[in-house]
């Protein structure tokens, strides 16, 4: 397996619950390294741009409103098979369907307020990382 980078957002609901450290610890215990991180209040334009692929879908307005409802933590994670590993750690999008012990099963409230976002492919990871981080802000460790 190759070392990959993936993008993660700890969403407003999880930030409000003060579980940033608990979520990040799960990434690290699984072998992922945080190589970039920012606590950030997204603007409406940033949220709309980030989720542009969903702009024609009915939930887009609610998604944008949720993502700007409070601060988020944007992170770049690095490790062996990082994209798949992060998705496994997160669990199913709907926390009611997420396996016990996953981040969403433990911290998410609903399919909308589902605690975390993670890249679903190498192409998405590259796009999402560059959306929030300059190359000089990502530091190998």
Swiss-Prot record:
Please give one Gene Ontology molecular function term for this protein: metal ion binding
What PROSITE patterns would the database entry show? NDPK, NDPK_LIKE
The lineage's top-level taxon is Bacteria
Active site per the UniProt annotation: 117 (pros-phosphohistidine intermediate)
**Broadest EC class assigned to this enzyme:** transferase
Q: Does the keyword Disulfide bond apply?
A: no
**Residues given in the record as ATP binding sites:** 11, 59, 87, 93, 104, 114
Query: Which named protein is this?
Result: Nucleoside diphosphate kinase
Q: Which reaction does it catalyse?
A: a 2'-deoxyribonucleoside 5'-diphosphate + ATP = a 2'-deoxyribonucleoside 5'-triphosphate + ADP; a ribonucleoside 5'-diphosphate + ATP = a ribonucleoside 5'-triphosphate + ADP
Name the Enzyme Commission number(s) assigned to this protein: 2.7.4.6
Q: InterPro entries under this entry?
A: NDK-like_dom, NDK-like_dom_sf, Nucleoside_diP_kinase, Nucleoside_diP_kinase_AS
Q: Which SMART domains match?
A: NDK
Q: Which cofactor does it need?
A: Mg(2+)
User: Which is a GO BP term held by this UniProt record?
Assistant: UTP biosynthetic process
């Amino acid at each position: 397996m190759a070392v990959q980078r993936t993008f993660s957002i700890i969403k407003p609901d999880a930030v409000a619950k003060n579980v940033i450290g608990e979520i990040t610890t799960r990434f690290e215990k699984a072998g992922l390294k945080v190589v970039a991180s920012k606590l950030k209040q997204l603007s409406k334009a940033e949220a709309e741009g980030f989720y542009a692929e969903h702009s024609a879908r009915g939930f887009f307005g609610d998604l944008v409103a949720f993502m700007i409802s409070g601060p988020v933590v944007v992170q770049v994670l690095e490790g062996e098979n990082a994209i798949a590993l992060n998705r496994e750690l997160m669990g199913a999008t709907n926390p009611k369907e997420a396996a016990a012990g996953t981040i969403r099963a433990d911290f998410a409230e609903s399919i909308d307020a589902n605690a975390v976002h993670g890249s679903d492919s190498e192409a998405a990871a590259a796009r999402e990382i560059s959306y929030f981080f300059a190359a000089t802000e990502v530091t190998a460790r």
